[in-house]
């Protein structure tokens, strides 16, 4: 029995978001298990997997040999191994790359479409979940595994939760919150991730950027002390030789259309406009504003003015909830 995604409604900014239950159908789950799973992942992703605690989750990058990200992954321990969450548009292609050397290790890597991904966000999200689970994650324990359910805590843009669980539990949560929460689809979670500065890598932007171009280092997702992994040389060079000239930015404003992932924007230069950047994600809110996540040069002036190509409206830089200072 499958879990049906909720019908879409216009996303709401975090500051005004009522209690909302979100079906995360644009995200997908994979599991990595087996005796060698930790060691195998250690050679494939940017973070120090051996240091990943039982109550932690981390946004890490999986790179090609040139240091470009196939994908980023929300990685955590689950049951007897690891689980990761990434965008559905590239999960299967990314897993093909991740499995390339698995034949030499005791490791099983599989896409998991049996379990359900749900988000709980908005006004009094914690209170809404309190009676449904014995323990909820928080700043001290951002991950709680409770039977078949993994609960992940996010601080930004406001406290919210991501649930990885079976269909029966997803149905139970849905029924418990029916009438109390509004329901929405992945676009609402996408809007919150843009506000939080959490990079969105969809298929169109796979193998285009080194991790630092999307701020993964600022989110604690790169270890510069661990042993080698695929793409490490290029990732290290970007740090120690200052080779990375790009960063992830959060823009907001108006636009007559929502830009698509992979397209560029335009930067105002005096009386003219110059193409710049690559859009990772964008969404239009219920109040008409457009939020855009974009990779651009890391030396942009804070008062720079942008627009969707040939548009009459403008976008401006918004603050991120973390520092990019090394």
From Swiss-Prot:
Domain of life: Bacteria
UniProt GO MF annotations: folic acid binding
Sites where the protein binds folate: 27, 189
tRNA processing recorded as keyword: yes
Keywords: Cytoplasm, Folate-binding, tRNA processing
Similarity field: Belongs to the tRNA-modifying YgfZ family.
Pfam families in the cross-refs: GCV_T (PF01571), YgfZ_barrel (PF21130)
Cellular localisation: Cytoplasm
Record protein name field: tRNA-modifying protein YgfZ
Function, as annotated: Folate-binding protein involved in regulating the level of ATP-DnaA and in the modification of some tRNAs. It is probably a key factor in regulatory networks that act via tRNA modification, such as initiation of chromosomal replication.
A cellular-component GO term for this protein: cytoplasm
UniProt GO BP: iron-sulfur cluster assembly; RNA modification; tRNA processing
Organism listed in the record: Enterobacter sp. (strain 638)
């Amino acid at each position: 029995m499958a879990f049906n995604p909720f019908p879409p409604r216009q996303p709401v900014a975090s500051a005004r978001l009522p209690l909302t239950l979100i079906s995360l159908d644009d995200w997908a789950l994979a599991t990595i298990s087996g005796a060698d799973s930790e060691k195998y992942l250690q050679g494939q992703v940017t973070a120090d997997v051996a240091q990943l605690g039982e109550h932690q989750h981390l946004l890490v990058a999986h790179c090609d040999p040139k240091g470009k990200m196939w994908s980023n992954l929300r990685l955590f321990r689950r049951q007897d191994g690891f689980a990761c969450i990434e965008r559905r548009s590239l999960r299967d292609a990314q897993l093909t790359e991740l499995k390339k050397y698995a034949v030499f290790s005791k490791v099983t890597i599989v896409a998991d479409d049996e379990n359900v991904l749900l988000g709980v966000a908005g006004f009094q999200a914690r209170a809404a979940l309190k009676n449904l689970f014995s323990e909820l994650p928080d700043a001290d324990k951002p991950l709680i595994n409770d039977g078949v359910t993994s609960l992940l805590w996010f601080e930004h843009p406001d406290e919210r939760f991501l649930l990885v669980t079976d269909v029966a539990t997803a149905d139970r949560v849905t029924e418990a919150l029916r009438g109390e929460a509004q329901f929405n689809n992945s676009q609402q979670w996408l809007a919150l991730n843009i506000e939080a500065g959490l990079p969105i890598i969809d298929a169109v932007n796979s193998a285009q950027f080194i991790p630092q171009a999307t701020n993964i280092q600022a989110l604690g997702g790169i270890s510069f002390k661990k042993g080698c992994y695929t793409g490490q040389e290029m990732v290290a060079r970007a740090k120690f030789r200052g080779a990375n000239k790009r960063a992830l930015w959060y823009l907001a404003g108006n636009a007559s259309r929502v830009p698509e992932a992979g397209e560029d924007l335009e930067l105002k230069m005096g009386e003219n406009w110059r193409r710049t950047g690559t859009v990772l994600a964008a969404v239009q809110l219920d109040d008409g504003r457009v939020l855009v996540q974009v990779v651009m040069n890391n030396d942009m002036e804070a008062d720079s003015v942008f627009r969707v190509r040939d548009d009459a409206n403008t976008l401006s830089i918004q603050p991120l909830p973390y520092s990019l200072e090394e």
